[in-house]
Amino acid sequence: MKFSEQWLRGWVSPQVSRDELVARLSMAGLEVDSVTLAAGVFSGVVVGEVLSTEQHPDADKLRVCQVSNGSETFQVVCGAPNVRPGLKIPFAMIGAELPGDFKIKKAKLRGVESNGMLCSAAELQAGEGNDGLMELAADAPVGQDIRVYLSLDDASIEVDLTPNRGDCLSVAGLAREVGALYAAEVTRPQVAAVSAVHDEVRPVEVLAPAACPRYLGRVIRNVDLSRPTPLWMVERLRRSDVRSIDAAVDITNYVMLELGQPLHAFDLAEINGGIRVRMAEEGEKLVLLDGQEVSLRADTLVIADHQRALAIAGVMGGEHSGVTAGTRDIFLESAFFDTISVAGKARSYGLHTDASHRYERGVDWQLAREAMERATGLLLEITGGEAGPVIEVVSEQHLPSIAPVTLRASRVEQMLGLVIENAEIERLLKGLGLAVTAEADGQWRVEVPSHRFDISLEVDLIEELARLYGYNRLPVRYPQARLAPQAKAEASGDLPELRRLLVARGYQEAITYSFIDPKWFELFSPGAKPLLLANPISNDMAAMRASLWPGLVKALQHNLNRQQDRVRMFESGLRFVGQLDGLKQEPMLAGVVCGSRLPEGWAQGRDAVDFFDVKADVEAVLGFAGALGEFTFTPGQHPALHPGQTARIERDGREVGFLGAIHPELSKTLGLDRPVFVFELVLAEVSTGRLPKFHELSRFPEVRRDLALLADRDVSASAVLDVIRENAGEWLTDLRLFDVYQGKGIDPHRKSLAVGLTWQHPSRTLNDDEVNATTLAILTSLEERLNATLRK
């Protein structure tokens, strides 16, 4: 909402500066976006009158004018196409300073002396018209300072209103707010009823009373739309960012800005029969005032005559029924359209108008009569004409009704944290036009006026009190609570620490959307039922993710498309899994790896990352909380992963994650031309560990045995290591697999595993007999349980 400060001060004028007024409005929730001066900075410009003009002797497009400033006559050379005798214009005399630090001096133009300058609106930065002189009213006082005459010491204030404050989309609404804020008197213009001088009416039928509970119409004959709109009205419209069109349209716009009631004027000659307010017929055509032809839907309310639609109700009129310079008789409409019926209709047709903006937010349903009389009076004053009687159709049962609200002083104190005197509460609320009746000490019955659609609960009234009292005046009270450090389990790892661990291993953290494309959901979780959003941001963000992989792989694609050949990313976030008893939101930690094992450098090659490189990163994460031994990697199957390079990660038999390469078919579908490895872990399992225990360091030598074992190809290395641990005794300090071989010299159905075992006794030196006996027990158990033998 943009308005003139002087226009507002004509209604209510607290004794405060512009800056203070703007700050107070913003603090009251009516946020001021901008303040723009009504004109540029200039001086020495007065109202001048062109007495005569003659052709310049040496220039076809220049005229030599005699201009009066009320006391003297000056010769001025002017090239404006609209200069003519009798015209009153802004006259910049010698010594005047125009915007841009442009000083007016005596000059010669093509040999003819010029003593001043006749100005356009653009040259004064008082409008956009640059195609001719700014034409002033015929009764403009010659010689008066133009800033005084046009009230240019003004500013346009633009307020960014929230959707619930449709009552402030007018000067009347803003004046009501300012009056309540400053306890200042609001002077509302007296609108007198216009007496009918003829009895012509057009019958009105409201066939959709729920959508249009109130409709008023009036015939005004013999208007003269060739008469110009008064300059004072044009200026107020300009400062409200509304362009002047013709007197009828300007007046309806002016009343809408002044009172908040949209109006529309139809050319009476284009109305066949009477007015019908009805729902459109499916596919019905209408050419709008902007020249756009629309195909109407059956849920759209229209204003029609007995033959065709004339306008989309509350949005825009039709071209064929709009007023023109040749219009002699008009039908003036003032109506209340239901908010729900109008909401969204303009956008659905690609439109947004001042009228639809107001109706969508709510218009005072008791305002239509006053607006009709106000517009009629202005029309008769400016364009002449004869007014007929007002015809009104009302469906009382469909008009809005707001129940009274009970307000308690105790609740006000509880929510705002301060005591406001009862008399002050009543004053503040009455200033907004609310009817307040005391029911008991500290309790009131509040009748909500028709212009406030956003007040229905006690908390709404308390919000109004806070706004008017001043948010900046509310006392600051800190929470009264005993603060204590939050306990943290020692045997756990924090997510920030896990993040730092992965960053130290060369990963970068990514943050992706929790919403993904349903097609991607199907790619990574085929057969699973996605959780679809009722109102998604877009079609490709319509499903909740059941895994963090889709977002990470999409981020990987983004990087690969930008020549980033080595990518290592991780993300922590929620996955969403539907269950019979509701929605499960589970924190996860996931990663994606692609490209070379090490960054490019002179000291290392460009070997590609493989499964075991990523497994090492996962083991570092699993071991962070000190419980790596509780996790096992077993061959697994996942629809999104390579069937031969997939590990299922378990802890005490529970699945806690997966690790593997993206399935070749999925890689092909996604356009990935190189191996991509991913992992995903349940964050709660990763974060829970075991408190480490101190063991005294042994001073005695270690004993190591390396075993080369032959095992069937389908026997996992972890199974071999588990059997070794079970039989190696309590003094085993280290066990590691350091080689796997398949090929020449080995049965094609077998593989060779090389493991290293290290023992160390805490209090003595182990002898060979003890170690050999333990080694023999290990080999015997391996052969019996896994058919694994010592390689010879």
Swiss-Prot record:
Keyword Mitochondrion (UniProt): no
UniProt GO MF annotations: ATP binding; magnesium ion binding; phenylalanine-tRNA ligase activity; tRNA binding
Listed SMART domains: B3_4, B5, FDX-ACB
Compartments (UniProt record): Cytoplasm
B5 domain ranges (all copies): 400-476
Record keywords, A-Z: Aminoacyl-tRNA synthetase, ATP-binding, Cytoplasm, Ligase, Magnesium, Metal-binding, Nucleotide-binding, Protein biosynthesis, RNA-binding, tRNA-binding
Cofactor names: Mg(2+)
Catalyses which reaction(s): tRNA(Phe) + L-phenylalanine + ATP = L-phenylalanyl-tRNA(Phe) + AMP + diphosphate + H(+)
Cofactor info, note text: Binds 2 magnesium ions per tetramer.
GO annotation, cellular component aspect: phenylalanine-tRNA ligase complex
Domain FDX-ACB per the UniProt entry, residue ranges: 698-791
Enzyme Commission no: 6.1.1.20
GO biological process: phenylalanyl-tRNA aminoacylation
Residue ranges of domain tRNA-binding in the record: 39-147
InterPro entries: aa-tRNA-synth_II/BPL/LPL, B3/B4_tRNA-bd, DNA-bd_dom_put_sf, Fdx_antiC-bd, Fdx_antiC-bd_sf, NA-bd_OB-fold, Phe-tRNA-ligase_IIc_bsu, Phe-tRNA-ligase_IIc_bsu_bact
Domain of life of the native organism: Bacteria
Binding site for Mg(2+): D454, D460, E463, E464
Key word Metal-binding present: yes
Oligomeric form and interacting partners: Tetramer of two alpha and two beta subunits.
HAMAP family the UniProt entry points to: Phe_tRNA_synth_beta1 (MF_00283)
Family: Belongs to the phenylalanyl-tRNA synthetase beta subunit family. Type 1 subfamily.
Protein name: Phenylalanine--tRNA ligase beta subunit
Source organism per UniProt: Pseudomonas syringae pv. syringae (strain B728a)
